[in-house]
UniProtKB/Swiss-Prot annotation:
Residues 18-57 bind DNA. GO terms for molecular function: DNA binding; DNA-binding transcription factor activity. Keywords: Cytoplasm, DNA-binding, NAD, Repressor, Transcription, Transcription regulation. It is found in: Cytoplasm. NAD(+) binds at G92, V93, G94, N95, L96, G97. This is Redox-sensing transcriptional repressor Rex. Homodimer. The keyword Cytoplasm applies. GO terms for cellular component: cytoplasm. The keyword DNA damage does not apply. SUPFAM superfamilies: NAD(P)-binding Rossmann-fold domains, Winged helix' DNA-binding domain. It comes from Halalkalibacterium halodurans (strain ATCC BAA-125 / DSM 18197 / FERM 7344 / JCM 9153 / C-125). Modulates transcription in response to changes in cellular NADH/NAD(+) redox state.
Length: 211
């Protein structure tokens, strides 16, 4: 198995966790092999795209046989660094932040929120699902070197200022749930998740592109 890092298109990289989750389900059900058409039906990605995605990693399957589920699962587990725990911090413990803490990636044993911050004096010091809520004023003193990813669920008005503090503290990745489009240096990656925008887009497609 090739363990060298492979540079792949970002669109492909975003689909890898989707493949991995389905492969986990297949493995749990005892299935030993799967075809690209079966994968396509399950993850709603056309089979040609799946084959192209997989081709970036070399020969992962055999023509006429398909893919060995256990082999693929092991391969993508290593590719997605699922053999190691990724510690994450949460900034903002409002309704969404609290929901994320309660969920805390329970279906993914390799990602875990280990610290949370807020400015609300009534929340500071409380514990939600085993995670103590710290004072955001103490952010820089509390961040440890093994936590380089942050989830941002603060009000949009303070999103950029908070992101600046995270970057200065050494954070390398931010999952931004705020409506603000935050600016960060080139060495920091941000993924924006705006639930309102996603819902508006869904409604638009339902009205203009009915199935």
């Amino acid at each position: 198995m090739n363990n060298e890092p492979t540079k792949i298109p970002q669109a492909t990289a975003k689909r890898l966790p989707l493949y991995y989750r389905f492969l986990e389900n297949l493995h749990a059900s005892g299935k030993q092999r799967v075809s690209s058409s079966e994968l396509s039906e399950a993850v709603k990605v056309d089979s040609a795209t799946i084959r192209r995605d997989f081709s970036y990693f070399g020969a992962l399957g055999k023509k006429g046989y398909g893919y060995n589920v256990n082999y693929l699962l092991t391969f993508f587990r290593k590719t997605l660094h699922q053999d190691e725990l990724t510690k994450v911090m949460l900034i903002g413990v409002g309704n969404l932040g609290t929901a994320l803490l309660n969920y805390n990636f329970s279906k993914n044993n390799h990602t875990q929120i280990v610290m949370a911050f807020d400015v609300d004096r009534e929340k500071i010091g409380n514990t939600v699902s085993g995670v103590k809520i710290e004072n955001l004023d103490n952010l820089e003193n509390k961040i440890t070197s093994d936590v380089s990813v942050a989830i941002l669920t603060v009000p949009a008005a303070v999103a950029q200022k908070t992101a600046d503090r995270l970057v200065n503290a050494g954070v390398k990745g931010i999952l931004n749930f705020t409506p603000a489009r935050i600016a960060v240096p080139e060495h920091v990656r941000v993924h924006h998740i705006d639930l309102s925008v996603e819902l508006q887009a869904l409604i638009y497609f339902l009205k203009h592109y009915p199935l």
